Amino acid sequence: MESVTRHRADMISFFTFDSYISIVGVAYTAVGLLGVFCNVTTVIMILTNRVFRLSAYTIMANVALADSIVMLIAGVACGMDVMWPNPNDLTSFIPSLEEPYQKIAPVSLRNDSKTDSSAAGFETGNIHAVLSFSFVAAWTAGVISYAMLGTNRCIAICYYGTKARALNQVSVAVACSASTWIVGIAAALVGTLSQPMIGIQRTMWSISFLEPRPHTTLFFTLLCAANLLGLGAQWVCSTLVLLKIRQVKKKISKNKLNQNSANRFRKQVILALNEIIVTGNFKARLTFQFFYPSILCTISTFLFFIKPYAFEYLSGWQLVILHLLWLCNHTCNPFIYAYFNDRMRLTYKEILTCAAIRYQIRKRRSSHPFRMHGRHNVSKRSNAAGMKSTRISARSGRTNRDGNFVRNSLQMQSRDFEQLCEFIMRVNPLYDSSEGWRESSDDEPFQPEFTKELESAHNQGGSSRFDSEREAKSIVLDLGRQTVEHWVKFAKKASI
Protein backbone atom coordinates (compact mmCIF):
# COMPACT_ATOMS: atom_id res chain seq x y z
CA MET A 1 0.00 0.00 0.00
CA GLU A 2 1.19 3.49 -0.68
CA SER A 3 1.78 6.19 1.88
CA VAL A 4 -0.86 6.75 4.53
CA THR A 5 -0.91 10.45 3.71
CA ARG A 6 -2.70 9.75 0.47
CA HIS A 7 -5.60 12.17 0.08
CA ARG A 8 -8.56 12.62 -2.15
CA ALA A 9 -10.13 15.91 -3.25
CA ASP A 10 -13.69 15.04 -2.26
CA MET A 11 -12.70 13.94 1.26
CA ILE A 12 -12.13 16.09 4.30
CA SER A 13 -8.53 17.23 4.20
CA PHE A 14 -7.48 15.92 7.59
CA PHE A 15 -8.68 12.36 6.79
CA THR A 16 -5.91 10.09 5.63
CA PHE A 17 -6.73 6.89 3.78
CA ASP A 18 -6.26 4.70 6.86
CA SER A 19 -8.37 6.97 9.06
CA TYR A 20 -11.11 7.01 6.43
CA ILE A 21 -11.06 3.20 6.34
CA SER A 22 -11.29 3.05 10.13
CA ILE A 23 -14.19 5.51 10.35
CA VAL A 24 -16.18 3.68 7.68
CA GLY A 25 -15.52 0.28 9.24
CA VAL A 26 -16.46 1.48 12.73
CA ALA A 27 -19.65 3.10 11.38
CA TYR A 28 -20.69 -0.08 9.57
CA THR A 29 -19.95 -2.25 12.58
CA ALA A 30 -21.68 0.08 15.07
CA VAL A 31 -24.87 0.38 13.03
CA GLY A 32 -24.82 -3.37 12.40
CA LEU A 33 -24.45 -4.21 16.09
CA LEU A 34 -27.22 -1.76 16.97
CA GLY A 35 -29.52 -3.35 14.40
CA VAL A 36 -28.73 -6.88 15.56
CA PHE A 37 -29.29 -5.94 19.21
CA CYS A 38 -32.61 -4.15 18.62
CA ASN A 39 -34.04 -6.80 16.31
CA VAL A 40 -32.97 -9.73 18.49
CA THR A 41 -34.51 -7.93 21.48
CA THR A 42 -37.75 -7.61 19.52
CA VAL A 43 -37.76 -11.33 18.70
CA ILE A 44 -37.12 -12.32 22.33
CA MET A 45 -39.75 -9.89 23.59
CA ILE A 46 -42.47 -11.21 21.29
CA LEU A 47 -41.62 -14.87 21.92
CA THR A 48 -41.43 -14.62 25.71
CA ASN A 49 -44.45 -12.39 26.43
CA ARG A 50 -47.86 -13.96 26.18
CA VAL A 51 -49.57 -10.65 25.49
CA PHE A 52 -47.76 -10.45 22.12
CA ARG A 53 -49.02 -13.83 20.87
CA LEU A 54 -51.08 -12.33 18.07
CA SER A 55 -50.82 -12.68 14.31
CA ALA A 56 -49.37 -9.22 13.68
CA TYR A 57 -46.71 -9.59 16.38
CA THR A 58 -45.77 -13.01 15.01
CA ILE A 59 -45.03 -11.52 11.60
CA MET A 60 -43.18 -8.64 13.28
CA ALA A 61 -40.94 -11.18 14.99
CA ASN A 62 -40.23 -12.83 11.65
CA VAL A 63 -39.31 -9.46 10.12
CA ALA A 64 -37.04 -8.71 13.08
CA LEU A 65 -35.32 -12.10 12.74
CA ALA A 66 -34.63 -11.51 9.05
CA ASP A 67 -33.38 -7.97 9.70
CA SER A 68 -31.03 -9.18 12.45
CA ILE A 69 -29.37 -11.64 10.06
CA VAL A 70 -29.09 -8.98 7.35
CA MET A 71 -27.54 -6.51 9.81
CA LEU A 72 -25.11 -9.13 11.08
CA ILE A 73 -23.78 -9.71 7.55
CA ALA A 74 -24.21 -6.34 5.84
CA GLY A 75 -23.24 -4.37 8.94
CA VAL A 76 -20.87 -6.29 11.19
CA ALA A 77 -19.21 -8.60 8.64
CA CYS A 78 -18.90 -5.88 6.00
CA GLY A 79 -17.53 -3.40 8.55
CA MET A 80 -14.92 -5.84 9.79
CA ASP A 81 -13.87 -6.59 6.23
CA VAL A 82 -13.45 -2.86 5.63
CA MET A 83 -11.21 -2.48 8.69
CA TRP A 84 -9.29 -5.76 8.33
CA PRO A 85 -9.28 -6.84 4.65
CA ASN A 86 -7.48 -9.89 3.34
CA PRO A 87 -3.70 -9.29 3.06
CA ASN A 88 -3.71 -10.35 -0.60
CA ASP A 89 -6.18 -7.58 -1.49
CA LEU A 90 -5.03 -4.56 0.53
CA THR A 91 -5.34 -2.17 -2.42
CA SER A 92 -8.82 -3.30 -3.45
CA PHE A 93 -10.39 -0.25 -1.82
CA ILE A 94 -8.13 2.29 -3.51
CA PRO A 95 -9.68 2.14 -7.01
CA SER A 96 -13.11 3.05 -5.65
CA LEU A 97 -11.59 6.10 -3.98
CA GLU A 98 -9.12 7.16 -6.63
CA GLU A 99 -11.02 6.51 -9.88
CA PRO A 100 -14.78 6.74 -9.29
CA TYR A 101 -15.58 7.44 -12.93
CA GLN A 102 -13.80 4.45 -14.42
CA LYS A 103 -15.40 1.07 -14.61
CA ILE A 104 -13.54 -1.30 -12.35
CA ALA A 105 -14.01 -5.03 -12.24
CA PRO A 106 -15.48 -5.98 -8.85
CA VAL A 107 -13.24 -7.81 -6.42
CA SER A 108 -15.09 -10.19 -4.13
CA LEU A 109 -13.96 -12.12 -1.14
CA ARG A 110 -14.75 -15.27 -3.05
CA ASN A 111 -11.54 -14.73 -5.03
CA ASP A 112 -9.50 -15.61 -1.94
CA SER A 113 -10.48 -19.27 -2.24
CA LYS A 114 -9.71 -19.27 -5.95
CA THR A 115 -6.19 -17.89 -5.68
CA ASP A 116 -5.17 -19.77 -2.56
CA SER A 117 -5.30 -23.56 -2.69
CA SER A 118 -4.41 -24.01 0.96
CA ALA A 119 -6.82 -25.20 3.62
CA ALA A 120 -7.16 -21.69 5.02
CA GLY A 121 -8.20 -20.32 1.65
CA PHE A 122 -10.72 -23.12 1.15
CA GLU A 123 -12.18 -22.50 4.62
CA THR A 124 -12.44 -18.77 3.93
CA GLY A 125 -14.29 -19.45 0.69
CA ASN A 126 -16.76 -21.69 2.52
CA ILE A 127 -17.35 -19.02 5.14
CA HIS A 128 -18.18 -16.43 2.50
CA ALA A 129 -20.46 -18.91 0.74
CA VAL A 130 -22.36 -19.43 4.01
CA LEU A 131 -22.60 -15.66 4.55
CA SER A 132 -23.90 -15.17 1.02
CA PHE A 133 -26.48 -17.94 1.46
CA SER A 134 -27.68 -16.52 4.80
CA PHE A 135 -27.90 -12.99 3.44
CA VAL A 136 -29.99 -13.93 0.40
CA ALA A 137 -32.35 -16.12 2.44
CA ALA A 138 -32.86 -13.52 5.19
CA TRP A 139 -33.26 -10.58 2.83
CA THR A 140 -35.82 -12.38 0.66
CA ALA A 141 -37.76 -13.61 3.70
CA GLY A 142 -37.78 -10.09 5.16
CA VAL A 143 -39.20 -8.47 2.03
CA ILE A 144 -41.99 -11.05 1.73
CA SER A 145 -42.72 -10.73 5.46
CA TYR A 146 -43.20 -6.99 5.00
CA ALA A 147 -45.86 -7.75 2.38
CA MET A 148 -47.60 -10.23 4.68
CA LEU A 149 -47.55 -7.76 7.56
CA GLY A 150 -49.17 -5.12 5.37
CA THR A 151 -51.81 -7.63 4.27
CA ASN A 152 -52.49 -8.56 7.88
CA ARG A 153 -53.05 -4.92 8.89
CA CYS A 154 -55.15 -4.24 5.81
CA ILE A 155 -57.49 -7.13 6.64
CA ALA A 156 -57.70 -6.04 10.27
CA ILE A 157 -58.72 -2.47 9.41
CA CYS A 158 -60.50 -2.64 6.06
CA TYR A 159 -62.00 -6.15 6.04
CA TYR A 160 -62.41 -6.89 9.74
CA GLY A 161 -66.09 -7.84 9.47
CA THR A 162 -65.67 -10.19 6.50
CA LYS A 163 -64.58 -13.80 6.16
CA ALA A 164 -61.05 -12.61 5.45
CA ARG A 165 -60.79 -11.98 9.18
CA ALA A 166 -60.05 -15.70 9.61
CA LEU A 167 -56.65 -15.12 7.99
CA ASN A 168 -55.53 -13.00 10.96
CA GLN A 169 -54.77 -15.92 13.25
CA VAL A 170 -51.53 -16.92 14.94
CA SER A 171 -51.45 -20.31 13.20
CA VAL A 172 -51.82 -18.64 9.80
CA ALA A 173 -49.11 -16.12 10.70
CA VAL A 174 -46.72 -18.91 11.72
CA ALA A 175 -47.39 -20.77 8.47
CA CYS A 176 -46.84 -17.60 6.43
CA SER A 177 -43.59 -16.88 8.29
CA ALA A 178 -42.35 -20.39 7.57
CA SER A 179 -43.26 -20.01 3.90
CA THR A 180 -41.18 -16.82 3.66
CA TRP A 181 -38.09 -18.73 4.78
CA ILE A 182 -38.84 -21.53 2.34
CA VAL A 183 -38.91 -19.00 -0.49
CA GLY A 184 -35.77 -17.32 0.86
CA ILE A 185 -33.85 -20.59 1.12
CA ALA A 186 -34.91 -21.52 -2.42
CA ALA A 187 -33.62 -18.18 -3.71
CA ALA A 188 -30.39 -18.63 -1.75
CA LEU A 189 -29.85 -22.08 -3.25
CA VAL A 190 -30.20 -20.65 -6.75
CA GLY A 191 -27.80 -17.83 -5.90
CA THR A 192 -25.10 -19.93 -4.22
CA LEU A 193 -25.43 -23.43 -5.69
CA SER A 194 -22.58 -23.19 -8.19
CA GLN A 195 -20.86 -20.12 -6.78
CA PRO A 196 -22.04 -17.14 -4.69
CA MET A 197 -23.63 -14.43 -6.82
CA ILE A 198 -23.87 -11.94 -3.94
CA GLY A 199 -20.98 -10.99 -1.70
CA ILE A 200 -18.99 -8.16 -0.16
CA GLN A 201 -17.94 -5.80 -2.95
CA ARG A 202 -14.95 -3.77 -1.82
CA THR A 203 -15.17 -1.54 -4.86
CA MET A 204 -18.71 -0.57 -3.82
CA TRP A 205 -18.14 -0.46 -0.04
CA SER A 206 -21.20 -2.67 0.29
CA ILE A 207 -22.76 -6.06 -0.41
CA SER A 208 -23.94 -6.47 -3.97
CA PHE A 209 -24.00 -8.74 -7.00
CA LEU A 210 -20.65 -10.20 -8.01
CA GLU A 211 -21.47 -10.51 -11.69
CA PRO A 212 -20.58 -7.47 -13.85
CA ARG A 213 -23.93 -7.87 -15.67
CA PRO A 214 -26.30 -9.31 -13.05
CA HIS A 215 -29.47 -8.69 -15.07
CA THR A 216 -28.48 -11.49 -17.45
CA THR A 217 -28.68 -14.15 -14.72
CA LEU A 218 -31.72 -16.15 -13.62
CA PHE A 219 -30.96 -15.37 -9.99
CA PHE A 220 -31.29 -11.62 -10.57
CA THR A 221 -34.65 -12.13 -12.29
CA LEU A 222 -36.05 -14.30 -9.50
CA LEU A 223 -34.82 -11.97 -6.77
CA CYS A 224 -36.17 -8.91 -8.55
CA ALA A 225 -39.57 -10.58 -9.07
CA ALA A 226 -39.84 -11.51 -5.37
CA ASN A 227 -39.00 -7.96 -4.31
CA LEU A 228 -41.42 -6.40 -6.78
CA LEU A 229 -44.18 -8.70 -5.55
CA GLY A 230 -43.50 -7.80 -1.92
CA LEU A 231 -43.30 -4.06 -2.59
CA GLY A 232 -46.47 -4.14 -4.69
CA ALA A 233 -48.41 -5.85 -1.90
CA GLN A 234 -47.11 -3.30 0.61
CA TRP A 235 -48.20 -0.35 -1.50
CA VAL A 236 -51.63 -1.80 -2.26
CA CYS A 237 -52.33 -2.56 1.40
CA SER A 238 -51.01 0.81 2.58
CA THR A 239 -53.16 2.61 0.01
CA LEU A 240 -56.30 0.72 1.06
CA VAL A 241 -55.68 1.51 4.72
CA LEU A 242 -55.11 5.21 4.03
CA LEU A 243 -58.24 5.39 1.88
CA LYS A 244 -60.26 3.72 4.65
CA ILE A 245 -58.96 6.19 7.23
CA ARG A 246 -59.70 9.13 4.94
CA GLN A 247 -63.20 7.84 4.20
CA VAL A 248 -64.14 7.38 7.84
CA LYS A 249 -62.64 10.72 8.85
CA LYS A 250 -64.63 12.48 6.14
CA LYS A 251 -67.86 10.81 7.22
CA ILE A 252 -67.28 11.69 10.84
CA SER A 253 -66.48 15.31 10.00
CA LYS A 254 -69.68 15.59 7.93
CA ASN A 255 -71.79 13.83 10.58
CA LYS A 256 -72.77 11.16 8.08
CA LEU A 257 -71.54 8.27 10.20
CA ASN A 258 -73.78 7.06 12.99
CA GLN A 259 -72.48 6.29 16.44
CA ASN A 260 -72.52 2.51 16.06
CA SER A 261 -70.41 2.61 12.88
CA ALA A 262 -67.91 5.01 14.42
CA ASN A 263 -67.54 2.85 17.53
CA ARG A 264 -67.19 -0.29 15.41
CA PHE A 265 -64.42 1.31 13.33
CA ARG A 266 -62.57 2.41 16.45
CA LYS A 267 -62.80 -1.11 17.89
CA GLN A 268 -61.51 -2.61 14.66
CA VAL A 269 -58.52 -0.30 14.61
CA ILE A 270 -57.69 -0.95 18.27
CA LEU A 271 -58.00 -4.71 17.87
CA ALA A 272 -55.93 -4.55 14.71
CA LEU A 273 -53.12 -2.31 15.86
CA ASN A 274 -53.29 -3.04 19.63
CA GLU A 275 -51.67 0.27 20.41
CA ILE A 276 -52.38 3.69 21.85
CA ILE A 277 -53.55 6.25 19.33
CA VAL A 278 -54.55 9.67 20.57
CA THR A 279 -57.65 10.94 18.82
CA GLY A 280 -56.05 14.16 17.62
CA ASN A 281 -53.09 12.32 16.05
CA PHE A 282 -55.09 9.34 14.81
CA LYS A 283 -54.81 9.96 11.08
CA ALA A 284 -51.25 11.30 11.24
CA ARG A 285 -49.88 8.31 13.15
CA LEU A 286 -51.59 5.73 10.99
CA THR A 287 -50.38 7.56 7.90
CA PHE A 288 -46.81 7.44 9.17
CA GLN A 289 -47.02 3.82 10.27
CA PHE A 290 -48.39 2.49 6.99
CA PHE A 291 -47.01 4.91 4.41
CA TYR A 292 -43.43 5.74 5.33
CA PRO A 293 -42.23 2.14 6.01
CA SER A 294 -43.30 1.32 2.46
CA ILE A 295 -41.25 4.25 1.19
CA LEU A 296 -38.19 3.16 3.19
CA CYS A 297 -38.44 -0.42 1.97
CA THR A 298 -38.85 0.76 -1.63
CA ILE A 299 -35.82 3.05 -1.42
CA SER A 300 -33.73 0.30 0.17
CA THR A 301 -34.64 -2.21 -2.54
CA PHE A 302 -34.02 0.34 -5.29
CA LEU A 303 -30.56 1.16 -3.92
CA PHE A 304 -29.59 -2.49 -3.77
CA PHE A 305 -30.58 -3.27 -7.36
CA ILE A 306 -29.31 -0.02 -8.91
CA LYS A 307 -25.91 0.00 -7.20
CA PRO A 308 -24.14 -2.40 -9.63
CA TYR A 309 -25.03 -0.07 -12.51
CA ALA A 310 -24.52 3.31 -10.79
CA PHE A 311 -21.41 2.74 -8.68
CA GLU A 312 -19.08 3.79 -11.51
CA TYR A 313 -20.64 7.26 -11.41
CA LEU A 314 -20.41 7.61 -7.62
CA SER A 315 -17.45 8.43 -5.42
CA GLY A 316 -16.41 6.51 -2.33
CA TRP A 317 -18.15 8.63 0.29
CA GLN A 318 -21.40 8.56 -1.70
CA LEU A 319 -21.33 4.77 -1.77
CA VAL A 320 -20.69 4.73 1.97
CA ILE A 321 -23.68 6.99 2.64
CA LEU A 322 -25.92 4.82 0.47
CA HIS A 323 -24.86 1.71 2.37
CA LEU A 324 -25.49 3.40 5.72
CA LEU A 325 -28.98 4.44 4.58
CA TRP A 326 -29.60 0.86 3.55
CA LEU A 327 -28.52 -0.35 6.99
CA CYS A 328 -30.74 2.19 8.75
CA ASN A 329 -33.77 0.82 6.91
CA HIS A 330 -33.24 -2.57 8.58
CA THR A 331 -32.62 -0.95 11.98
CA CYS A 332 -35.54 1.47 12.30
CA ASN A 333 -38.37 -1.04 12.82
CA PRO A 334 -37.87 -1.55 16.59
CA PHE A 335 -37.86 2.23 17.08
CA ILE A 336 -41.13 2.52 15.12
CA TYR A 337 -42.67 -0.22 17.27
CA ALA A 338 -41.55 1.48 20.47
CA TYR A 339 -42.89 4.85 19.34
CA PHE A 340 -46.37 3.67 18.37
CA ASN A 341 -46.97 0.91 20.94
CA ASP A 342 -46.88 1.75 24.64
CA ARG A 343 -46.87 -1.89 25.66
CA MET A 344 -43.87 -2.67 23.48
CA ARG A 345 -42.11 0.45 24.72
CA LEU A 346 -42.65 -0.65 28.34
CA THR A 347 -41.39 -4.15 27.57
CA TYR A 348 -38.33 -2.76 25.78
CA LYS A 349 -37.60 -0.69 28.87
CA GLU A 350 -37.96 -3.70 31.16
CA ILE A 351 -35.60 -5.77 29.02
CA LEU A 352 -32.98 -3.06 28.57
CA THR A 353 -32.98 -2.16 32.27
CA CYS A 354 -32.90 -5.85 33.32
CA ALA A 355 -36.05 -5.41 35.39
CA ALA A 356 -36.54 -9.16 35.88
CA ILE A 357 -32.99 -9.65 37.17
CA ARG A 358 -33.25 -6.67 39.50
CA TYR A 359 -36.56 -8.01 40.80
CA GLN A 360 -35.00 -11.39 41.60
CA ILE A 361 -32.11 -9.64 43.38
CA ARG A 362 -34.49 -7.54 45.46
CA LYS A 363 -36.56 -10.61 46.20
CA ARG A 364 -33.52 -12.52 47.42
CA ARG A 365 -32.34 -9.60 49.53
CA SER A 366 -35.77 -9.11 51.07
CA SER A 367 -36.05 -12.81 51.90
CA HIS A 368 -32.66 -12.72 53.71
CA PRO A 369 -32.33 -9.11 54.88
CA PHE A 370 -29.78 -9.66 57.71
CA ARG A 371 -27.68 -12.52 56.35
CA MET A 372 -24.89 -10.22 55.18
CA HIS A 373 -24.56 -8.59 58.60
CA GLY A 374 -24.71 -11.78 60.65
CA ARG A 375 -27.88 -10.86 62.50
CA HIS A 376 -30.19 -13.78 63.22
CA ASN A 377 -32.42 -12.29 65.92
CA VAL A 378 -35.39 -11.77 63.62
CA SER A 379 -38.38 -13.91 64.44
CA LYS A 380 -39.84 -16.33 61.94
CA ARG A 381 -43.15 -14.50 62.10
CA SER A 382 -41.64 -11.17 61.04
CA ASN A 383 -39.59 -12.89 58.32
CA ALA A 384 -42.72 -14.59 56.95
CA ALA A 385 -44.57 -11.27 57.05
CA GLY A 386 -41.78 -9.64 55.06
CA MET A 387 -41.85 -12.37 52.43
CA LYS A 388 -45.63 -12.08 52.21
CA SER A 389 -45.45 -8.32 51.69
CA THR A 390 -42.83 -8.87 48.98
CA ARG A 391 -45.10 -11.31 47.16
CA ILE A 392 -48.03 -8.91 47.47
CA SER A 393 -45.96 -6.02 46.12
CA ALA A 394 -44.76 -8.15 43.20
CA ARG A 395 -48.32 -9.17 42.36
CA SER A 396 -49.49 -5.58 42.66
CA GLY A 397 -46.67 -4.48 40.34
CA ARG A 398 -47.69 -6.99 37.70
CA THR A 399 -51.33 -6.04 38.18
CA ASN A 400 -50.49 -2.38 37.74
CA ARG A 401 -48.58 -3.08 34.52
CA ASP A 402 -51.40 -5.19 33.10
CA GLY A 403 -53.94 -2.66 34.27
CA ASN A 404 -52.04 0.13 32.58
CA PHE A 405 -52.03 -1.88 29.37
CA VAL A 406 -55.78 -2.48 29.44
CA ARG A 407 -56.51 1.07 30.52
CA ASN A 408 -54.35 2.57 27.78
CA SER A 409 -55.60 0.20 25.09
CA LEU A 410 -59.23 0.98 25.93
CA GLN A 411 -58.79 4.73 26.01
CA MET A 412 -61.17 5.39 23.16
CA GLN A 413 -63.82 3.05 24.49
CA SER A 414 -63.60 4.82 27.85
CA ARG A 415 -64.46 8.10 26.18
CA ASP A 416 -67.48 6.49 24.57
CA PHE A 417 -68.51 5.04 27.91
CA GLU A 418 -68.21 8.44 29.59
CA GLN A 419 -70.45 9.93 26.92
CA LEU A 420 -72.88 7.08 27.53
CA CYS A 421 -72.96 7.83 31.26
CA GLU A 422 -73.51 11.53 30.63
CA PHE A 423 -76.38 10.66 28.31
CA ILE A 424 -77.91 8.37 30.92
CA MET A 425 -77.60 11.07 33.59
CA ARG A 426 -79.28 13.55 31.27
CA VAL A 427 -82.24 11.43 30.29
CA ASN A 428 -82.71 9.65 33.63
CA PRO A 429 -81.52 11.67 36.65
CA LEU A 430 -83.79 9.70 38.99
CA TYR A 431 -81.78 6.49 38.35
CA ASP A 432 -84.76 4.47 37.25
CA SER A 433 -83.79 0.81 37.04
CA SER A 434 -86.06 0.02 34.12
CA GLU A 435 -84.80 -0.28 30.55
CA GLY A 436 -87.18 2.37 29.28
CA TRP A 437 -84.47 4.87 28.34
CA ARG A 438 -85.61 7.50 25.93
CA GLU A 439 -83.54 9.88 23.86
CA SER A 440 -84.56 13.45 24.62
CA SER A 441 -83.42 16.70 23.08
CA ASP A 442 -82.25 19.71 25.01
CA ASP A 443 -85.20 21.81 23.78
CA GLU A 444 -88.04 19.76 25.24
CA PRO A 445 -88.48 19.59 29.03
CA PHE A 446 -87.56 16.47 30.94
CA GLN A 447 -90.37 14.13 32.02
CA PRO A 448 -89.65 10.96 34.00
CA GLU A 449 -90.60 7.63 32.50
CA PHE A 450 -92.81 6.56 35.38
CA THR A 451 -94.92 9.75 34.91
CA LYS A 452 -95.33 8.94 31.24
CA GLU A 453 -96.28 5.40 32.15
CA LEU A 454 -99.02 6.61 34.52
CA GLU A 455 -100.34 9.05 31.95
CA SER A 456 -100.37 6.42 29.24
CA ALA A 457 -102.19 3.95 31.47
CA HIS A 458 -104.69 6.58 32.52
CA ASN A 459 -105.41 7.87 29.02
CA GLN A 460 -105.38 4.64 27.04
CA GLY A 461 -106.29 2.14 29.73
CA GLY A 462 -103.21 -0.04 29.36
CA SER A 463 -99.47 -0.20 29.08
CA SER A 464 -99.17 -2.10 25.80
CA ARG A 465 -98.38 1.06 23.88
CA PHE A 466 -95.83 2.10 26.49
CA ASP A 467 -94.14 -1.32 26.39
CA SER A 468 -93.75 -1.20 22.62
CA GLU A 469 -92.37 2.33 22.81
CA ARG A 470 -89.97 1.33 25.57
CA GLU A 471 -88.76 -1.67 23.60
CA ALA A 472 -88.17 0.41 20.48
CA LYS A 473 -86.15 3.05 22.31
CA SER A 474 -83.61 0.95 24.23
CA ILE A 475 -80.72 2.03 22.01
CA VAL A 476 -78.59 3.41 24.81
CA LEU A 477 -78.49 0.24 26.86
CA ASP A 478 -77.77 -1.81 23.75
CA LEU A 479 -74.80 0.45 23.05
CA GLY A 480 -73.60 0.08 26.63
CA ARG A 481 -74.03 -3.69 26.53
CA GLN A 482 -72.03 -3.91 23.30
CA THR A 483 -69.28 -1.79 24.82
CA VAL A 484 -69.02 -4.01 27.90
CA GLU A 485 -69.01 -7.17 25.79
CA HIS A 486 -66.23 -5.72 23.68
CA TRP A 487 -64.18 -4.98 26.81
CA VAL A 488 -64.61 -8.55 28.04
CA LYS A 489 -63.54 -10.01 24.68
CA PHE A 490 -60.52 -7.72 24.53
CA ALA A 491 -59.45 -8.64 28.07
CA LYS A 492 -59.71 -12.36 27.26
CA LYS A 493 -57.77 -11.88 24.04
CA ALA A 494 -55.03 -10.07 25.92
CA SER A 495 -54.99 -12.95 28.47
CA ILE A 496 -55.40 -10.58 31.41
Swiss-Prot record:
Q: Which residues lie on this side of the membrane: Cytoplasmic?
A: 41-58, 150-169, 238-285, 340-496
Lipid bilayer topology: Multi-pass membrane protein
GO CC, one annotated term:
plasma membrane
Q: Which Gene3D superfamilies match?
A: Rhodopsin 7-helix transmembrane proteins (1.20.1070.10)
Q: Where is this region: Disordered?
A: 451-470
Q: Which residues cross the membrane?
A: 20-40, 59-79, 129-149, 170-190, 217-237, 286-306, 319-339
Q: At the top level of its lineage, which domain of life is listed?
A: Eukaryota
Q: Which SUPFAM superfamilies match?
A: Family A G protein-coupled receptor-like
Molecular functions per Gene Ontology: G protein-coupled receptor activity
InterPro entries registered for this protein in UniProt: GPCR_Rhodpsn
Keyword tags: Cell membrane, G-protein coupled receptor, Glycoprotein, Membrane, Receptor, Transducer, Transmembrane, Transmembrane helix
Please give the chief subcellular localization of this protein.
Answer: membrane
Task: Give the positions annotated as glycosylation sites.
Answer: N111
Q: Where does this polypeptide localize?
A: Cell membrane
Q: Name one GO biological process term.
A: G protein-coupled receptor signaling pathway
Those parts of the protein on the Extracellular side are 1-19, 80-128, 191-216, 307-318
The UniProt family comment states:
Belongs to the G-protein coupled receptor 1 family.
**Could you tell me what this protein is called?**
Probable G-protein coupled receptor K01A12.3
| Originating organism | Caenorhabditis elegans
**Upper taxonomic lineage:** Eukaryota, Metazoa, Ecdysozoa, Nematoda, Chromadorea
